From Swiss-Prot:
Species: Nicotiana sylvestris (Wood tobacco)
Protein name per UniProt: 31 kDa ribonucleoprotein, chloroplastic
Function (record text): Could be involved in splicing and/or processing of chloroplast RNA's.
Pfam families documented for this protein: RRM_1
Domain RRM: 136-214, 230-308
Location in the cell: Plastid, Chloroplast
Source taxonomy: Eukaryota, Viridiplantae, Streptophyta, Embryophyta, Tracheophyta
FT transit peptide: 1-71
A single MF term (Gene Ontology): mRNA binding
Length: 315
């Protein structure tokens, strides 16, 4: 038995927005030897007209998972609400600070308190340390070249409390320039130091101590008295002769008030001449008459009356 089937209704194509519907084919059976009758296929079938079906679509709305209260609040804070014109709605941004102090405000306040405490401590330190007055600073000249800042401080400690002691050195040679500065704690101690150490003998050299000049002022120089008739110039003296040896040499001819060998400030070496002041004119004349042209350690010295500086500057 053979069976042939044909679809009664052909599927038809619809429009783009229409649905495609196809009906199941109905089978018609033909037999050669035997025929089978089906009650529901006994009648002839008529074609079925299809109605034009329209199909519309709408976006699907998926409901998200249930959010926790914390995540919902975070999303709400980070969401911008736009009005119909595309402008940002400011309702979410208009908020008033709560009465509780924020972390940032607390940090700023803590920093402010720390700054105030630092200022108070700095003020207390300034009150404890007071800079010595300018009038307590002294100039010390004609220092021996082997005296350093520490030795200068120890020397002036006998007059009071030494705040600062400094010997000035040459930058190139790193040798003492023969002078320095000492700052005492009070003006009274500075005045006492001037009385004690001005014309004070240190290693054969007489110190010059007076008040140092203030900032912007010229150094104060004490008035000098030149005893022209008693002051002697001594030239061509040997390099190894110091103040003490020069004084000893002239003391054989009278009372020596002062004896000084002139040294180079840069190198600290003797310049080969000096000055001697005798107590009287007679003693000065006797020393010149006996010592001029004499040999001293292999060198012939020159001895004569020292020239007055005031008269020398007039030429």
């Amino acid at each position: 038995m053979s069976c042939a089937t044909k679809p009664i209704i052909k599927p038809s194509s619809m429009a783009t927005n229409s649905c495609l519907i196809s009906l199941p084919p109905l089978f018609a059976t033909t037999t050669k030897s035997k025929s089978f009758a089906y009650p529901y296929l006994s009648n002839t079938l008529k074609p079925i007209k299809l109605l034009h079906l329209s199909c519309t679509y709408s976006p699907c709305i998926l409901s998200p998972k249930k959010k926790t209260s914390v995540s919902a609040l975070q999303e709400e804070e980070n969401t911008l609400i736009l009005d119909g014109q595309g402008q940002e709605s400011g309702d979410l941004f208009n908020f008033e600070p709560s009465g509780e102090e924020t972390e940032e405000e607390g940090f700023v306040e803590a920093v402010g308190d720390a700054g105030e405490s630092d200022e108070v401590e700095a003020d207390e330190e300034e009150e404890e340390f007071q800079e010595p007055p300018e009038d307590a600073k002294l100039f010390v000249g004609n220092l021996p070249y082997d005296v350093d800042s520490e030795g200068l401080a120890r020397l002036f400690e006998q007059a009071g409390v030494v705040e600062i002691a400094e010997v000035i050195y040459n930058r190139d040679t790193d040798q003492s320039r023969g002078f320095g500065f000492v700052t005492m704690s009070t003006v009274e101690e500075a005045e006492k130091a001037v009385e004690m150490y001005n014309r004070y003998d240190v290693n054969g050299r007489l110190l010059t101590v007076n008040k140092a000049a203030r900032r912007g002022e010229r150094p104060e120089r004490p008035p000098r008295t030149f005893e022209q008739s008693y002051r002697i110039y001594v030239g061509n003296i040997p390099w190894g002769i110091d103040d003490a040896r020069l004084e000893q040499l002239f003391s054989e001819h009278g009372k020596v008030v002062s004896a000084r060998v002139v040294y180079d400030r840069e190198t600290g070496r003797s310049r080969g001449f000096g000055f001697v002041t005798m107590a009287s004119e007679a003693e000065m004349s006797d020393a010149i008459a006996n010592l001029d042209g004499q040999s001293l350690d292999g060198r012939t010295i020159r001895v004569n009356v020292a020239e007055d500086r005031s008269r020398r500057n007039t030429f």
